[in-house]
A protein has these predicted regions:
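Surface-exposed repetitive/solenoidal architectures
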Residues: 123-536
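A short beta-strand micro-motif common to beta-rich folds, especially ectodomain repeats
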Residues: 91-108
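Short coil/turn motif common to extracellular beta-sandwich-like domains
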Residues: 42-46
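Surface-exposed binding patches on compact interaction domains or structured appendages
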Residues: 29-34, 48, 52-81, 86
Length: 536
C-alpha cells in the first residue's frame, strides 16, 4: 500500500514539472527594421538591416543580392551588396525585383517564423539625344539632313527604322532655308586622262538609301562656283548609294574656273543607282574659264563604274529618270568639242569606266529628257554628252529641242560622243537640233555626233524623228541618225525620219535617197535594215 502511494505521488510531481516546462517555452520572435529596399541601377549603395530574433535563422535572396551572412542565431546586423543593373550609356536595362527571406525557429524555440523584405532595383533607360523622326518631316529637317549627308554626319535622325532608308515624309520647299551651298561644294575627285582611276577627297560620300516616296523638293536654288576637280549637286558624291522616287526643281546655277562636274541631283555617282527621279526648273551656267572638262547633267554631272580598288568594283545605273528642266548654258571661254570641253547631258554629263573593266558599266535605261536646251557649248545632248567608256544607253528618249550657237560642236540629241565598249539600244529622238552659228564647222546628228572607236559593242534600234538645222554648208557630217559613223560596228534596225535644213534650205529626202542622209558612214555595209518614215 505504501509503494502504491509513492508511485502516485511521483507521477503527480512529473505532471507538475511537465506543465511547468510547457509554460516556459516562448513564441519565436523575429523582426527587421526595414519593410522594403529600393536601390539605383548604377553604383547601388549597400544597405544594412537589423534583425531581432530569439531563433536560429537562415537567409535566401536573389543572385544579384549578396548578404553578409546567410545563417545565424539570434540578433544580427546584416549588410547587403547589390550588383549593378547598368551596362553602358547606350544600352537600356529593365528594372528588377525580388525578396530577401529570413526563416527562423528550430532548436531554440518550439515554433518557426518568417520575415520577407521586398527588394527593387531600378533599370537604366537610354534617351537618344538625336532620336529618329522616322524620316524627313519638313524643310528645316531636310536642310539639316542634306548638310549631314554631304559632310559625313549621322543620318540616324532621318532614317526610317523599319526600312533602313532615309525617307522623305512631306513635300519640301527649300526657298526659305539658308543653306551655304558654296560651302558644301568642296568635294574633289581626280582621275587620269582615260579615267582608269578615281580618287574622291575632301568629303564623305552619301552611301545610304534616300527614298523620296514620290514627294517634291522645290526651291533648290544654289549659285556655286567650282574650282579644280570639284563636284557639286544636291548630293555632292553618291557612292554605293540609292537615290529614288523624288522630284527636284529650282534654278541650278553653277560655273567653273577649272575642271569640274555638276548635276542637279548628284555631282558624282560611283557604283550607285538613281531611279524614278524627276528634274524640273532651270539649269543655268556661264561656263568655265579653263580649257578643261566642265560637265553638267540634269540628274548627274559625272558617273563612274568599275574598279576603284583591289576590293571594290561596281556598276552605276540611272533608270526611270525624267528631266523637264530648261537649260541655258554658255561654255564661256571653253568652246572646244572634245573630252575637255564644256558639255551638257539631260541625264548625265560624262560617264565612264576604266578601259580594262568593260564588264562593269554605267547604264542609262528607260530615261527621258523633255527639257529644251538653249546653249553655246561644244557637246550637248538630251541624254548623255559623253559616253567615254563602258556605257549602255537603252530605251531612252529625247523630246527636247536643242539650239546651239557654238561655232564648232559635236552635237547629237541622244549622245554626242560614243566610244570604247559602249552600246546604244532603242534610242529615240523627237527633238529638233539647230546649230545657229554662222559658218558652223561642226557635226550634227539626230542620235549621235561621233562614234569613232573600233570596239563599240553595239548599236541598234536608233530612231530619229527630229529636224536637223545647220549652217554647215558642206553638210558632210550632218545626218538624220548620226553625224559621223566612223567605225565598222554593225548598226541595225533603225528608223530614219525627220528633216534636214542646210543654210536655211531643206534637203530633199525620200525613199530613194534617205540612206545618203542618215549620216556619214565609214563602212556603209555595216549599217543594215534602216527604215525610212516620211515626216509628217
Amino acid at each position: 500500500m505504501k509503494n502504491i502511494f509513492k508511485s502516485i505521488l511521483a507521477l503527480a510531481c512529473c505532471g507538475a514539472i511537465f506543465a511547468s516546462c510547457e509554460q516556459e517555452v516562448p513564441e519565436t520572435e523575429m523582426s527587421v527594421d526595414l519593410t522594403s529596399i529600393e536601390v539605383e541601377a548604377q553604383n547601388p549603395e549597400s544597405v544594412a538591416v537589423t534583425l531581432t530574433t530569439n531563433a536560429n535563422w537562415i537567409l535566401t535572396c536573389p543572385d544579384w543580392v549578396t548578404p553578409s551572412a546567410t545563417y545565424g542565431s539570434g540578433d544580427a546586423i546584416l549588410s547587403f551588396q547589390f550588383a549593378t543593373n547598368y551596362k553602358d550609356e547606350l544600352t537600356t536595362t529593365r528594372a528588377r525585383s525580388g525578396e530577401i527571406k529570413i526563416s527562423g525557429g528550430g532548436s531554440l524555440t518550439g515554433k518557426g517564423a518568417v520575415v520577407t523584405i521586398p527588394v527593387n532595383q531600378l533599370g537604366y533607360t537610354y534617351v537618344d539625344p538625336n532620336p529618329s523622326l522616322g524620316g524627313i518631316t519638313d524643310a528645316e529637317e531636310f536642310a539639316k539632313f542634306i548638310v549631314a549627308a554631304n559632310t559625313g554626319g549621322s543620318l540616324k535622325r532621318w532614317t526610317n527604322e523599319e526600312t533602313g532608308e532615309v525617307l522623305l515624309l512631306e513635300d519640301i520647299d527649300l526657298s526659305g532655308e539658308e543653306i551655304d551651298w558654296q560651302a558644301l561644294a568642296d568635294a574633289t575627285k581626280t582621275s587620269n586622262a582615260n579615267n582608269a582611276s578615281l580618287v574622291v577627297e575632301n568629303t564623305t560620300p552619301f552611301e545610304g538609301v534616300f527614298n523620296g516616296d514620290n514627294h517634291k523638293i522645290t526651291g533648290f536654288n544654289p549659285v556655286v562656283v567650282l574650282g579644280a576637280n570639284q563636284t557639286f549637286g544636291l548630293f555632292q558624291v553618291a557612292h554605293n548609294a540609292t537615290i529614288k522616287n523624288v522630284e527636284l526643281s529650282g534654278t541650278f546655277n553653277v560655273t567653273a574656273t577649272d575642271q569640274a562636274d555638276a548635276g542637279m541631283l548628284v555631282g558624282t555617282a560611283i557604283h550607285s543607282t538613281i531611279s524614278n527621279v524627276k528634274i524640273g526648273g532651270k539649269i543655268v551656267s556661264a561656263g568655265t574659264t579653263a580649257s578643261k572638262r566642265f560637265s553638267i547633267g540634269g540628274v548627274c554631272g559625272y558617273a563612274y563604274a568599275g574598279v576603284i580598288s583591289e576590293t571594290e568594283v561596281g556598276k552605276t545605273l540611272f533608270e526611270g529618270c525624267v528631266v523637264n528642266a530648261e537649260v541655258e548654258f554658255d561654255g564661256g571661254t571653253n568652246q572646244a568639242n572634245g573630252a575637255t570641253s564644256a558639255m551638257y547631258g539631260g541625264i548625265c554629263g560624262f560617264a565612264t569606266t576604266p578601259n580594262a573593266d568593260a564588264a562593269h558599266k554605267v547604264t542609262i535605261k528607260n530615261c527621258v529628257n523633255n527639257g529644251n536646251m538653249n546653249v553655246k557649248i561644244g557637246r550637248c545632248s538630251g541624254i548623255l554628252a559623253t559616253a567615254n567608256t563602258g556605257v549602255i544607253l537603252e530605251d531612252v528618249t529625247n523630246n527636247g529641242d536643242q539650239v546651239n550657237n557654238v561655232a564648232n560642236g559635236r552635237l547629237g540629241n541622244i549622245v554626242c560622243n560614243i566610244s570604247y565598249y559602249c552600246t546604244l539600244k532603242n534610242c529615240i529622238n523627237n527633238g529638233d537640233l539647230t546649230a545657229v552659228a554662222d559658218g558652223y564647222k561642226g557635226t550634227a546628228g539626230g542620235i549621235f555626233a561621233l562614234a569613232g572607236a573600233a570596239n563599240i559593242t553595239g548599236m541598234e534600234g536608233l530612231e530619229n524623228y527630229g529636224t536637223i538645222k545647220t549652217l554647215n554648208t558642206a553638210g558632210k557630217y550632218v545626218g538624220l541618225l548620226w553625224a559621223n559613223h566612223n567605225n565598222t560596228i554593225p548598226t541595225t534596225n533603225c528608223v530614219a525620219s525627220g528633216r534636214i535644213f542646210i543654210d536655211g534650205a531643206e534637203v530633199e529626202i525620200s525613199e530613194a535617197n534617205y540612206m545618203e542622209k542618215v549620216g556619214y558612214m565609214k563602212d556603209p555595209s555595216c549599217v543594215t535594215n534602216v527604215r525610212w518614215v516620211a515626216p509628217k
